[in-house]
Every structure is written in structure tokens, then in C-alpha cells.
């Protein structure tokens, strides 16, 4: 037993530097840009844009008007992941995850509908434009969910 203890301690000491590496820096926070206002305010999250060839993936936030309730629960809106074909100008909404008042998310519900042409002036076309050319978005309107909800709701009030 006495010879095993030094061997274990030596093993722990040799392993410690590998385990002691600092954690990787946190991922970039959201950078939300208002893309349109209709029944809902829609914001694109520039921090989620990833492109491979003509295909781009991005997350968006749909913000509801104040006091939007379903089944007695108040909602801020919901998140969706999208893929866009920048050359074909098609959009594919992959899911929807509701956001309850206070910021609790989910669960995500998959959207099995096939990709469709992004009609000019519609939410999908506005998101596609930003996803395919993120530099056209300019500065972010919000860098967190609560601020995005405030921005979206202010835009909804102005649109009325």
C-alpha cells in the first residue's frame, strides 16, 4: 500500500497541468438586429451566422406584443433556427422554441416543412438578406434577450 500511494500521487501531479488548463473563452453573446415588424417583431442573431458555400444557418428571435398569453402563460416570443440557400433564395425554418416571460426557453419543436422561396418583403426574405450578407445589418440593436424583447416591443408599438 505504501508504494502505491506515491505512484498515485505522482500520477495525479503529472495529470494536473492538463486538467488545470483554463476553460476556453465563452462563446460570443447574441448580436440581435431588428429585421422586420409585422404581427411579430423579428430579430436576426448575427452571432449565430455560419456559412458553407451557398448555405447559411442562423438563429432568429420572434418577439410578441406585451401581455401575449397562451393557456395562462405569458410569452416574450420564440427562437427559431433557419437554413438559407443564398443562391436559390430559399428559406427553411428548422424549429421553434417558445420563450416564456422571464426568458425560459423551450422545448424546441421541429418544423418538418421543406425549404420554400423567400417572398420579397416577408420575414424569411428579410432574415435571408442578413444571413447571406451579415455586414449589411450594421450595428446590433441588442446583445441579450431582455433587450431584444424591449427593442422588438418598441418596434411593434411604433408599427401600430
Question: Where would I find each of the regions flagged by the language model?
Answer:
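N-terminal secretory-pathway/extracellular module detecting exported/lumenal segments
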Residues: 19-160
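Bacterial N-terminal signal peptides
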Residues: 7-16
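Positively charged n-region of N-terminal signal peptides that target proteins for export
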Residues: 1-4
